[in-house]
Swiss-Prot record:
Gene Ontology molecular function, alphabetical: 4 iron, 4 sulfur cluster binding; ATP binding; metal ion binding; oxidoreductase activity, acting on iron-sulfur proteins as donors; oxidoreductase activity, acting on the CH-CH group of donors, iron-sulfur protein as acceptor
Assembly notes: Protochlorophyllide reductase is composed of three subunits; ChlL, ChlN and ChlB. Forms a heterotetramer of two ChlB and two ChlN subunits.
The organism's taxonomic lineage, starting at the top: Bacteria, Bacillati, Cyanobacteriota, Cyanophyceae, Synechococcales
Active site location: 290
Binding site residues for [4Fe-4S] cluster: 36
Full protein name: Light-independent protochlorophyllide reductase subunit B
Family: Belongs to the ChlB/BchB/BchZ family.
The organism of origin for this protein: Synechococcus sp. (strain CC9902)
Catalytic reaction annotation: chlorophyllide a + oxidized 2[4Fe-4S]-[ferredoxin] + 2 ADP + 2 phosphate = protochlorophyllide a + reduced 2[4Fe-4S]-[ferredoxin] + 2 ATP + 2 H2O
Length: 541
């Protein structure tokens, strides 16, 4: 067991709550102590929903453990069915209740209710939230569809051609507390409609039990979020022969690939491969003269597996960034993330320890961080600009405006949200011209945050400097708390630091890295001004 101030994912029963709260007519009875009711706040505060999630807690207390807690479970199940009259009932237990082993699912199944009951067995001590959401969706869909007749001729995704209708698809995976899921559904529905494809149903977001029963009426399943929907789509492929798309349409290239894959599976004519050039502004904006400052920017990417893979492709192929760090907290997505990192010449960071992520971020010295809410906090401490690309997120990442991540419009949103935190090229020239002005010293960078964690680092060891400007020194020491990790064996002398400060701060990080690499190569423990000059000559040769 590990004590932490932050976790990227909640326990699996929170994932089950996400599925139940996303749907209509589904109720979740959760065998849990009173302390586990905190999850309600995730939906009312983060998602800003006007109603509580459809969850009934047994809320047992310590004194109940000496009696028959099974009767407590049965009473709450009975009351929930009578009060809410759900079309389907989910029954499970929290991490604490799992230790009691009351088996609430089996109890509910023996109570004789005339409605579908799905028993959830979510191992709280080995799995987490996204897995819990995936397993809940899989068990719910399987429980509702298992008795449907299977077409003896097999499922034909091209049947629409003979039936004289437009092709139909299901959108599987969008849920509450997902990153921009509502807007993604709207954008992908519009995109498919523009290609003559209808959406049969969306599951689980805003879906009813009747919608789930209609899943097999579609020609194709679209797996929008692999963490949530891949297991469900795989089961439907095995059970009913329904194929599903695997490309996540985030970014111009991925959206084009997504359309090509969907058209191919449905037997439609291939789409125009250059559609994205006139449907999204990202290709033109990223190729414009004003955007040449994007090329080579160092970017660190961390989040859930699906969004990390999409972000890495956009950063590398569409914006010309240099990806210097790639990782995920989702162990279920570790394999594809490792493969993507290997293609970029990196070693993937698979961890749910935010301190390890922050240390890797500081060591990589990025100029932009793409991550979760926690990476935004870490980047702020290090003085690095950041854009949130993945859950877990803050309420400010659930905007009132239309702000998808998928499709052509999603590419526009991504360009704006990733590029705006960066310093524009003209700003760099102006700061270079006026860097000696008191308004442009390191302590007055305002909101720019363009500097990497090590670029803004200035270690003031001289007593005179501390006496003259103690406030600035304390700020600098706070920014450079991570530098010691990366340079524990190297020491900058006073004249070396003084010479380094003469270099414009927006390139200072690169000079520092090169000089330290040069010093390590030469076996030096101290870096003075002469070492700095030698390193400059070495890399300029």
């Amino acid at each position: 067991m590990e004590l932490t101030l932050w976790t990227y994912e909640g326990p699996p029963h929170v994932g089950a709550m996400r599925i139940a709260a996303s749907m209509k007519g589904v109720h979740y009875v959760l065998h849990a102590p009173q302390g586990d009711t905190y999850a309600d706040l995730l939906f009312t505060m983060i998602e800003r929903r006007g109603k509580r999630p459809p969850v009934t807690y047994t809320t047992f207390q310590a004194r109940d453990l000496g009696g028959d807690t099974a009767e407590l479970v049965k009473r709450h199940i009975r009351e929930a069915v009578e009060r809410f009259k759900p079309d389907a009932l989910l029954v499970g237990e929290s991490c604490t209740a799992e230790l009691i082993q009351d088996q609430p699912g089996a109890l509910a199944g023996g109570m004789g209710f005339d409605l579908p009951i799905v028993s959830l067995e979510l191992p709280a001590y080995s799995k987490k939230e996204n897995w819990g959401a995936s397993e809940t969706l899989y068990q719910l869909v399987r429980g509702l569809l298992k008795n449907q007749e299977i077409n003896s001729e097999g499922h034909n995704p091209k049947a629409w051609q003979n039936q004289g209708r437009r092709p139909r698809v299901n959108l599987i995976g969008p849920s509450l507390l997902g990153f921009r899921c509502r807007d993604d559904v709207i954008e992908i529905s519009r995109l498919l409609a523009s290609h003559g494809i209808d959406v049969n149903t969306v599951v689980p977001l805003e879906a009813t039990v009747a919608d789930v029963m209609r899943l097999t009426e579609a020609d194709l399943n679209i797996c929008l979020y692999a963490e949530i929907s891949e297991s469900c789509c795989s089961w439907m492929e095995r059970q009913f022969g329904m194929p599903f798309s695997r490309t996540m349409p985030i970014g111009v290239g991925a959206t084009a690939d997504f359309l090509a894959e969907v058209h191919g599976l449905l037997g439609m004519d291939p789409p125009d491969p250059r559609e994205g050039e006139h449907s999204s502004k990202l290709p033109w904006y990223s190729a414009s003269v004003d955007s040449t400052y994007l090329t080579g920017k160092r970017v660190f990417i961390f989040g859930d597996g699906s969004h990390v893979l999409a972000a890495a492709r956009i950063a590398n192929e569409e914006l010309g960034f240099q990806v210097v760090g790639l990782g995920t907290y989702s162990r279920e997505m570790a394999r594809p993330v490792r493969a993507a990192a290997k293609e970029l010449g990196l070693e993937a960071l698979i961890s749910d320890d935010y301190l390890a992520v922050e240390a890797a971020m500081a060591e990589a010295v990025p100029e932009l961080v793409l991550g979760t809410q926690m990476e935004r906090h870490s980047a702020k401490r290090l003085g690095i600009p950041c854009a949130v690309i993945s859950t877990p997120m803050h309420v400010q990442d659930v905007p009132a405006r239309f702000s998808p991540q998928m499709g052509w419009e999603g590419a526009n949103v991504i360009f704006d949200s990733w590029v705006h935190p960066l310093m524009m090229g003209l700003e760099e020239h102006l700061i270079g011209m006026f860097r000696h002005d008191f308004e442009f010293v390191d302590g007055h960078q305002s909101h720019l945050g363009h500097l990497g964690g090590l670029q803004s680092a200035q270690v003031e060891d001289a007593p005179a400097a501390i006496a003259n400007n103690s406030t600035e020194t304390h700020a600098i020491e706070a920014d450079t708390s991570s530098v010691a990790v990366a340079t524990a064996t190297l020491e900058w002398t006073m004249d070396g630091e003084a010479e380094l400060k003469k270099i414009p701060f927006f390139v200072r990080g690169k000079v520092r890295r090169n000089t330290e690499a040069f010093a390590k190569e030469k076996g030096l423990n101290q870096i003075d001004s002469e070492t700095l000059y030698d390193a400059k000559a070495h890399y300029s040769a």
